[in-house]
Amino acid sequence: MTEYLAALLPGLAFEAALAALRAAAAPYDAPCREVPGGIAVDIWGGEVRLALTGRAPALAVSAPDMRILFVLQDALGSAFEAAGCPPVWDRVDEGALAPGLSLMRVVSVRQVSPGFRRVRLAGADAARFGAQGLHFRLLLPPAGQVPEWPRIDARGRTRWPEGAAALHRPVYTVRALDGGAGWLDFDIFVHEGGGATEWSTSVQPGAKVGVMGPGGGWVPAAGHVTLIGDETALPAIARILSLLPDGAQGSAHVAVAAADLPDLPRPTGMALHRLEGHGALLPALEAVEVPGADRFVWFAAEKCLAEAARKLLRARGLGKSEMMAAGYWAAEGEV
């Protein structure tokens, strides 16, 4: 069912409103298009229309569900506040949990290999994390404190707890999920100094956490898929391999310890290779054979390596829709 919101932008010229809408759409590579009476842009399966109503510009927002609707409300609020004109919405769910936030409880934590720990969470709406995005943001409250969760304020913006109540907010990949049973699994790469690593060492069953999403990319739709990444990318690579159609062709290359790389379930046409160290990632990307069409190359590792991979892929002639190179962490800290 389609959901709707509307807002006025009093005191803002139409051209300034259009510039703010373009700024809001830019991170999603969503171009504006002309529609009768105004301009529209498509984001996350929803639509935002800007039109001149009377003397003031107005927004009309539609989305396939409430989560996306209120995520758009938050994003548009940010863009138009930056333009000096907060939208006046016809509806704001003030005090509600932030859009896309579910509260779940820890069921179990177990070591699945020397370098990885698997956490199972349970929640009534776990099923929604099985589509529309591979990733989610894990919200961890400070140890020993009563959690304060992000909520919607009077302007439709998400307000996050600050100071001593600030949440740790790492991003993880859904490793497995059973929507009917109401649980999802994710894997933590165990490393010194990691906030989630420390949390997983001591957390007890029944502990409450926030899970926000889903988000990020989805399974590449191309017939030939190349996946390359380091330890931090292994959960996403494993998830993608498990969701690829049977006829998929290509290969996966992971820089990870041998003890941490099982024989991952995958289509018969997808080869799996282990790389020795992060220094082998870019050479593997340079050497891999990629067809001229119906292709997708997925790369995730340290931020600087991802930037180099992006340049390399562009030099090989791949377009934006044929590749992804993401920095999952930075040498100076987590991304």
Model-derived regions: residue spans:
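Extended, composition-driven regions rather than compact fold-specific motifs
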Residues: 1-335
